[in-house]
Amino acid sequence: MNRLTPTRSISNPTLGDVTRAMVEFAHKGKQDLEVRRLCEIICEDLAQGDYAGECLAIYYWVCQNIRYMRDIHDVEFVKEPARVLETRSGDCDDMATLLAAMLMAMGNRCDFVLASFNGAAVPSHVYVRVYSPKGPIVLDPVANRDTGKMLGELTSASTVPV
């Protein structure tokens, strides 16, 4: 990975533009051997077959190792998982894309959950729902950073299959 690892800048983005880029990058990331190897390292001490434990271990790794950083005002950047790992930073869509790629690299199915807060009609946040053998698990690396007050009261949520 280097400074030329792709990032997509979207001017005047629609929600569809952003989610399409996220889905594309998550599928590309799940096939990245560095992403897979990192997941193997993160999960190496877990019991074989502890798939829910793998999901949580990967989630906690993202929470502890990727810094939340907002995009430039009025410019939407969507980073490929390799770029997020390289910079160790990203906003909610970057962190969700990396998390989904890592979870899918370990054989899990995921959705992106698009959320609106405080009565807003347009989603302003995204997180991941992963389907483990024990059932769906909601994973939000941004909310894990005590930003629940920043996010406000959930108005609505919709899903985009990855």
Where do the language-model regions lie?
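A structural boundary/capping signal
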Residues: 1-162
